[in-house]
């Protein structure tokens, strides 16, 4: 039996020591002290950052929301059914990010940026933090380009500009989502990426929205971020921030984007739920004190960026649901004060057949007027006042039957203008056609048409113009203003159509 020499043994040991790799993975680990309703209390993570992503040994993830002296309050993304007392948690040392860029366009994602449409993984190397600082004053430019919704009542009376925040507010079932979807459909060919964030909606409602967008070919330039009613409060709270991070990518790359939050009332409720579980002190309507801040920091990220930064824009259309038309409730007043105007939809108008049910008196656009094209300004300059006078006269006629001729004429024209502003859902109208029909109503071309036939008159007018006077629509589209020659041509076209039109 051969004996091993001492030198051989030492050389083998030396070789082993040389090849030994000290692969030590340092991780800061804590333990779950308590877990209830999607919020975990963790002990032992002293160096954790605010809103840092944490990993549970069960595979669940969450973000650190409450940083206390001896513990950390963590919002868990899913329902965390396997998390229990004693479960270990480790830091990732990274804040929450979502995929951004063209790879997400045409997809349906959850609040974490994960695809839920069954079309495979999102292949991108571009990610963005969901919490970003809004552009400062010097990085912004005043709103001056129109963002047309295709809805006559909005584009004429409460115009929206690129980079604006315009609130859509009203009771449930008044057509708020329809206004938003119409606006998305109308962005076709305008090089605007649209992001629809569904917060606390029914899965069936979101599926219907996606179907509508696909039907009108709008999904090609849209992203849907969904945190439905069946998702946890954490997912509903994070969804708008994930959506705006995707929109900011386009804004910062000299492109234009539109984001719709449907709706921020449910977002506030989700945040209230999380805050109460985290034992934060409740305030008015049991909302935490910083509920204003969560919405202001979200909506301030919508902006028109200055030329030096690429002149991109992100326009926001937040939706808020009111209870019995009460716009003076906590969340509605908060968001009205943050936004640059509101479109107020009314139940009474909706049920009386005026759709979209926009209350022209209460709706306002604080900055959009500068973005309106000249042609629309020319034809709708006195429209708001005319409609207000019509409503006043209408109320007066309920008590007095005898009216002078001028008042009767005003009442008749007002009725026709209300008909002109009616519009079927999912049928946005190009701005040049809007200019034509509002001009026809304002200049008295509809005075001899019966009120019931105004919609029919409008439907037959467009094919007539396209066939016989295509240059009228083309010139309004190109010039974006009505000069004397163009107005004369439009008058001639309308007079000729009136002769051929029979009710």
Swiss-Prot record:
Compartment(s): Cell inner membrane
Which enzyme type, at the first EC level?
translocase
E.C. no? 7.1.2.2
Which reaction is catalysed here?
Answer: ATP + H2O + 4 H(+)(in) = ADP + phosphate + 5 H(+)(out)
Q: Which SUPFAM superfamilies match?
A: C-terminal domain of alpha and beta subunits of F1 ATP synthase (SSF47917), N-terminal domain of alpha and beta subunits of F1 ATP synthase (SSF50615), P-loop containing nucleoside triphosphate hydrolases (SSF52540)
Q: Which GO terms describe its cellular component?
A: plasma membrane; proton-transporting ATP synthase complex
Record's InterPro entries? ATP_synth_asu-like_sf, ATP_synth_asu_C, ATP_synth_asu_C_sf, ATP_synth_F1_a_nt-bd_dom, ATP_synth_F1_asu, ATPase_a/bsu_AS, ATPase_F1/V1/A1_a/bsu_N, ATPase_F1/V1/A1_a/bsu_N_sf
Q: Which residues bind ATP?
A: 170-177
Query: In this chain's numbering, which residues are marked as the site (Required for activity)?
Result: 363
Quaternary structure (record): F-type ATPases have 2 components, CF(1) - the catalytic core - and CF(0) - the membrane proton channel. CF(1) has five subunits: alpha(3), beta(3), gamma(1), delta(1), epsilon(1). CF(0) has three main subunits: a(1), b(2) and c(9-12). The alpha and beta chains form an alternating ring which encloses part of the gamma chain. CF(1) is attached to CF(0) by a central stalk formed by the gamma and epsilon chains, while a peripheral stalk is formed by the delta and b chains.
Function (record text): Produces ATP from ADP in the presence of a proton gradient across the membrane. The alpha chain is a regulatory subunit.
Family of the protein in this entry: Belongs to the ATPase alpha/beta chains family.
Instruction: Give the protein name, as stated in the record.
Output: ATP synthase subunit alpha
Phylogenetic lineage: Bacteria, Pseudomonadati, Campylobacterota, Epsilonproteobacteria, Campylobacterales
Source gene?
atpA
